[in-house]
Each structure stands twice: as structure tokens, then as C-alpha cells.
Amino acid sequence: THECSSAASDVYKRQRKILITSSMSKIKTAFHCQECGAKYAKWQGQCNKCGSWNTISEEIVELAQVRAWNHMSSDLSVSKNIPTPVDEIVIKDEFRIETNDNEFNRVLGGGIVPGSITLLGGEPGIGKSTLFLQISLKINSRVLYVSGEESENQIKIRANRIKHSNKECLIYSENKLENIFAQAEKIKPNILIIDSIQTLTTKTVDSLQGSITQLKTCTAELINFGKRTSIPVMLIGHINKDGNIAGPKVLEHMVDTVLQFEGDRNHLYRILRVKKNRFGSTNEIGIYEMVSEGLKEIVNPSE
């Protein structure tokens, strides 16, 4: 019996070694520029695409294909949809979610479309977080506001300054995508806000926080989540030295709407521009004034 047990153990160890070797052989790496997302077969000092120096790093680009929100207890990741004739598709009454911010509503084309993915870019300190937090507090809907940069106490201090109240605004300080999806499944918010996309990580990708691979994977997972649950996802993104949203340009192609928050930190006025909008015009702008209570809508700029 002891010999059989020992033999079985040896077989298990050999099989385990084969599985590990096979698994490792499937891992592929590539070199990406952390500024523009350009891909290279080997390391080099300068990026040929954007000209940045020392921004190219090696990342794992292929692992086991496991979705971040497959780890949740529900069967959300299993599609229950079937193809539907376009004439039979019924647009629900909640086609647009009103934000109680007229400037923001107009820029989006009338409000937030359920299941849509919106990306907001802008310089540090320009007011991106303030804008999204203010919308979270003004809207008459349940909002899950996730921050990977600030603690709940820090966000509460800003919320007190804004002086709007929404009992359905839930603050969650977290940067692990799996935990965020688990809470979203439990809370079932009407809107999910991520501040910021560069702070998120998923265990399905073995690379550093903010890397190109993490950015693309987390964004793809959030898009998949939004489309399957009809929960709109609003992302805040940092910008690089050229004024573009940090990371690969493909991020802007992946999302439905790209907004740019502009202004001079030494002056009070802010302009919200729309660079891309699958559900509305790109000719609208929103104008705000930064005041002690947050962002004040400027309805008539000529006054």
C-alpha cells in the first residue's frame, strides 16, 4: 500500500510539473510604451511613436483567459441575450438618466445612456473628481462612486464642501476590479463611477498598476459589465504631457463617450468638451465656474 501511494504521488508530481510547464509556455510578453501604448518586440530607450524616453517596459500580454467578474457568485457573465430584430427592440423609458446638471446633460445629448461607457480626461487638479462627485450627489439615482486615489474620509470632506446630498450615493475606496464587481452585484447601482481607471488592477493580468495591459484589460472588463447589466460606467482618466488621456489611444476607441475637462487652475472657469459621442453631438460644450461649493453651472456665458 505504501508503494502504491508513493507511486501515485510520483505520478501526481510529474503531471503537476507538466501542467506548470505547459502553463508557463503559454505566457507571452511584449514591451509597451507607458505614454502612448506603442508595442515593441524588445526594449529600447526611446519610443519611436511619441518620442518619450525610458517609458518602455515589459508586460505579460497573454495569460489564462479568465474574466475578472467570472469570480462573482452570480451568472452575470453568462449571456442570456439572443439576436433580436431591430423593429422589435423596445426603447425603455429610462433611455436617458437625468443628472440634474443641465450643462452635463446637454454635453452628453440629454443625459446618461444606460450601459454606456464615458471617459473623462483633464489635467490634475482641474476638477474632474469634483465634477463626477457633484453629479453623484445631485442625481436622483443610486450611485456607486469608487475611488482608487482617495480614502472615504477625504471624499466626505469634498462632499461636505459641495453641499449637495444624495442618500443613495455610496462611496467605496478600492482599486481591485474583482472587489468592485462584487460590490456592484450586491448594491445594483444605477451608475458606476471609477476614479480613476489608471488606479485599477485585475488579478487576471500580471502587470503593474497603471500599465498598458492593466488599463486595456480593466477597461474591457468594465465595458463588458456595463453592456450586460445596462449600468452606465463613468471613468476618470489622467492625461499625459501632450494633453491626451494617458495610455493607449485604443481606450478612446473602446468607450462610447470621451469628455475633456479644460481650464486654467489659476482661473475659475472650466469648459467641458466632448471629443466623441456615440449617442449625441460633439459640438456641445458645458461651462462651469469653480467656486467654494464646487462647480457652478454657467447657463448664460454672455452675462
Model features per residue range: what roles?
Residues 1-15, 45, 155:
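Single conserved hydrophobic/aromatic residue that forms the stacking wall/gate
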